[in-house]
Amino acid sequence: MMQNNPFPYSNTEKRYHTLNYHLREHFGHKVFKVALDGGFDCPNRDGTVAHGGCTFCSAAGSGDFAGNRTDDLITQFHDIKNRMHEKWKDGKYIAYFQAFTNTHAPVEVLREKFESVLALDDVVGISIATRPDCLPDDVVDYLAELNERTYLWVELGLQTVHERTALLINRAHDFNCYVEGVNKLRKHGIRVCSHIINGLPLEDRDMMMETAKAVADLDVQGIKIHLLHLLKGTPMVKQYEKGKLEFLSQDDYVQLVCDQLEIIPPEMIVHRITGDGPIELMIGPMWSVNKWEVLGAINKELENRGSYQGKFFQRLEEESAL
């Protein structure tokens, strides 16, 4: 804990439980995530469960900053690692399978892809982004095996707890499916990171707070809080043109994220609290490209409030006793 910072899971001015802090505590040194494109598709695009994909999702399957899909995984990894090494000379790496749905393949395909990068020098773990409806038993069994011998996260896209919004964004699974996916993974002790998005069409502050509260009540170990950013070429552009989407202001976003941080468990690891997209594809909100300004504003607001992650968190058993 840093002097004048009451939050226990921090050794800087940050008043929330950053992934960087967690990884340093776990491994004892700096660890970087290397975002890869494993060449997968998505069941919400290829017709397995639906067509068209989530309306906010880019042509890169939300992997706009991942490696080049046309390169093999080893080439992708080394290209990104070498760029990172120019700035940070020391550190280890987590292979992050980010683009599309990274369990949407037979187990033997998953094994070939995941094991190839885990065998690389300085790779200490793997993070796998997927959908809760893409966790058949044999895949979960393989993930459980991975979890026994390496550092593993499975990242699941919830986005919102509200079924009306889920239909509007064509998520193509319901909240119960999400809960079942979490439970399948947690049965094997696998770390789960929930993704939520602030600023989805027709959602107000209370709805976004309800999504954060739902995540707080789940047995998940991490959360990514994204800002919705609208990209050219996505289906959501049509919703925007029809007036179904208004961008959050920077101040509203900062206030909202601080409110959300206050109600999630202090031990929950915050993998992200903002987001941006490729500048050449961005329609808005354009303030989001100033990521460091947004991060600074969030921490400043928490400081001004005398607050921190988990200040108002109540566990379900505590609530039921009230």
UniProtKB/Swiss-Prot annotation:
Residues 26-267 form the Radical SAM core domain. This is Uncharacterized protein YtqA. Binds 1 [4Fe-4S] cluster. The cluster is coordinated with 3 cysteines and an exchangeable S-adenosyl-L-methionine. InterPro entries: ELP3 (IPR039661), Elp3/MiaA/NifB-like_rSAM (IPR006638), Radical_SAM_C (IPR032432), rSAM (IPR007197), rSAM_horseshoe (IPR023404), YhcC-like (IPR005911). Keywords: 4Fe-4S, Iron, Iron-sulfur, Metal-binding, S-adenosyl-L-methionine. One of its GO terms (molecular function) is 4 iron, 4 sulfur cluster binding. Gene3D superfamilies: tm_1862 like domain. [4Fe-4S] cluster binds at residues 42, 54, 57. The keyword Glycosyltransferase does not apply. SUPFAM superfamilies: Radical SAM enzymes (SSF102114). PROSITE patterns: RADICAL_SAM. Its cofactor is [4Fe-4S] cluster. It comes from the Bacteria. It holds the Pfam family Radical_SAM_C. Belongs to the radical SAM superfamily.
